[in-house]
Regions:
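Phosphate-group recognition and catalysis centered on beta-loop-alpha active-site segments
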Residues: 1-250
Length: 250
């Protein structure tokens, strides 16, 4: 099996954060459609498990910020979660927008030949299991597709679960700081990318990642000066909320 770091990089440079940043309710199909309207072909989303192991999209552990529900999303069965309103918090135009499953989003992406970055966002306490289940489902859904989704996580245990379950799927280590051993961790997980808070990239860190055969991605880049700096550094991917500002053709 060819190591991921040695394979060609198939993904676009520009990635729409949570579908379309703040232009639509995050992590919904409405957001993906909005991002696509602005020309984006790759999307980032957050995936976690319901109590009955359905993979669905949501960033927070709790429901109250982005739905009309309450409590911890991972404590509820999908039948309950599927009835929630995930759009009204954003604006009246999106009232009634449901939480999507990973399968819903995958269907949209595959049908339109879009690319997906799935951030594994586990409910605390089930990091490894979430990585396993997300990877297993992604491997099944994309088994006949030329380009699989990129699986990323801040949680090393989630990436370990994904690695064990579907080692052929590409992985990226998410970082909000460069603690000791960060690059060795990415290597041990056989990652193809390191996804950093954009301010962490320097000529030295970019070179270290590239020399290790991995790509450098950045989150969440919403200012033009930051995007220009990252392009000058030679980074490989930019995750942004501002799909209305940055042209994905740039």
């Amino acid at each position: 099996m060819t190591p991921h770091s040695a394979r060609p990089w198939p993904y676009p440079r520009w990635v729409a954060h949570r579908g379309a940043g703040t232009l639509a309710p995050e992590n919904t199909l409405a957001a993906f459609r909005k991002g696509a309207e602005h020309g984006y072909r790759m999307f980032e989303c957050d995936a976690k498990l319901s109590a009955d192991d359905v993979v669905f999209l949501m960033h927070d552990a709790t429901l109250h910020r982005t739905t009309n529900g309450h409590g911890i999303g991972g404590d509820l069965n999908w039948q309950h979660l599927s009835q929630l309103d995930a759009g009204s918090w954003h604006s009246r135009n999106f009232s009634g927008e449901p939480l999507p499953t990973l399968a819903n989003v995958a269907q949209f992406c595959i049908r339109n030949r879009y690319f997906l970055n799935i951030e594994i966002k586990p409910t605390p306490g089930i990091e490894y299991k979430t990585g396993e289940v997300v990877a297993r489902e992604a491997a099944h859904i994309w088994q006949h597709e030329a380009v699989p989704p990129l699986l990323t996580s801040f949680q090393v245990e989630s990436l370990k679960g994904a690695f064990k379950t579907a080692p052929h799927l590409p992985r990226g280590l998410l970082l909000n700081s460069l603690s000791e051993g960060w690059l060795d961790t990415a290597k041990a997980l056989e990652c193809c990318a390191v996804v950093c808070l954009y301010a962490l990239w320097t000529p030295e860190t970019v070179k270290a990642v590239h020399d290790a055969g991995m790509k450098c991605l950045s989150y969440t880049v919403n200012d033009e000066w930051a995007a220009e700096h990252l392009l000058q550094l030679g980074t490989d991917g930019i995750i942004t909320d501002r799909v209305d500002v940055f042209s994905p053709a740039a």
